Amino acid sequence: MAKQLQARRLDGIDYNPWVEFVKLASEHDVVNLGQGFPDFPPPDFAVEAFQHAVSGDFMLNQYTKTFGYPPLTKILASFFGELLGQEIDPLRNVLVTVGGYGALFTAFQALVDEGDEVIIIEPFFDCYEPMTMMAGGRPVFVSLKPGPIQNGELGSSSNWQLDPMELAGKFTSRTKALVLNTPNNPLGKVFSREELELVASLCQQHDVVCITDEVYQWMVYDGHQHISIASLPGMWERTLTIGSAGKTFSATGWKVGWVLGPDHIMKHLRTVHQNSVFHCPTQSQAAVAESFEREQLLFRQPSSYFVQFPQAMQRCRDHMIRSLQSVGLKPIIPQGSYFLITDISDFKRKMPDLPGAVDEPYDRRFVKWMIKNKGLVAIPVSIFYSVPHQKHFDHYIRFCFVKDEATLQAMDEKLRKWKVEL
């Protein structure tokens, strides 16, 4: 056709590095520690809840309420209302979406207008930038910077900090929203109360909405505490809090997410939702509702999944850290999430000339080399940065440690072979 087919809002966002690395991994005998999903079953109670939804009330095969299956919106309002210290109305303050991804897209489409600026904290979950651009907005980036590490010690995600003056300087009269991700993907940083108070004060000062992606909120380790910024004084009325049943119950294929927020903002998300997705799968929502009802009864008790799961994943994290160190990698200990990043600076010094395009960031060339030669899949951390900042953070790669014991043992075998070759 002579006419340009694609909308201009798609310019510059058509390349997806995930496709390249997934394809490369499929061509080799590898242990895939790249993509963020568990390779073990969801908890029994969640599977049983889905079975109840499929085999029970036949009306669960039909549409439910556009903005969420009523038992699900009710339990989300009750559960998170207590956590956030808010009276949450299931009809006005809760929207069920097609996963956390759908929640993010709906939020950007509802709030971001042509020329609006959106502050994104780096490293960032890679969809934030294209979603901002598709809505007509301009992403504005501010980076977490790693602090010094004592000789012989491992770094921690808690040492990566925002510069308060730099962050404040990113706000302008065009700033519409700030995107916060805690625990952070890929870094695993859990923002402290002091850090959240800084963000909150700037959002209030400049009348900016905070879109907070908290899909990993139950995966917090070493006694750290997840704090929702919406629970801070003056923030509920300007915050959209996004969650994911896939991450919460280790069932990423269910694709149920949600947004919590004040009605004066949520009404605009409902407009986008009803004119795009319209409705989310009823049976998945019913299973999530039953699972949350169970967890509410057991909340903070030793038998709660929200207590047991992070304990198990901390053991997986520690296993991976020990194993990666055996070949000279230097993990940054994450406070939360599915992921850890590891410093490959020593390899960059020893093997500076890995194959690849001249302008290709080193971490991408290293991951390709590792897939082909060592049989391990990771994700280059530079893809979680804006293009101008990628060259400053091309000496880190990301691993997912939320994996079955058999997968971690297979990783160990690959690393043993690697160690012999050193």
Curated annotation (Swiss-Prot):
Its EC number is 2.6.1.7, 4.4.1.13, 2.6.1.64. InterPro entries: Aminotransferase_I/II_large, Kynurenine-oxoglutarate_AT, PyrdxlP-dep_Trfase, PyrdxlP-dep_Trfase_major, PyrdxlP-dep_Trfase_small. Its cofactor is pyridoxal 5'-phosphate. It catalyses: L-kynurenine + 2-oxoglutarate = kynurenate + L-glutamate + H2O; 3-phenylpyruvate + L-glutamine = 2-oxoglutaramate + L-phenylalanine; an S-substituted L-cysteine + H2O = a thiol + pyruvate + NH4(+). It comes from the Eukaryota. The keyword Lyase applies. It is found in: Cytoplasm, Cytosol. Pfam families: Aminotran_1_2. Homodimer. Catalyzes the irreversible transamination of the L-tryptophan metabolite L-kynurenine to form kynurenic acid (KA), an intermediate in the tryptophan catabolic pathway which is also a broad spectrum antagonist of the three ionotropic excitatory amino acid receptors among others. Also metabolizes the cysteine conjugates of certain halogenated alkenes and alkanes to form reactive metabolites. Catalyzes the beta-elimination of S-conjugates and Se-conjugates of L-(seleno)cysteine, resulting in the cleavage of the C-S or C-Se bond. This is Kynurenine--oxoglutarate transaminase 1. It comes from Homo sapiens. The gene is KYAT1.
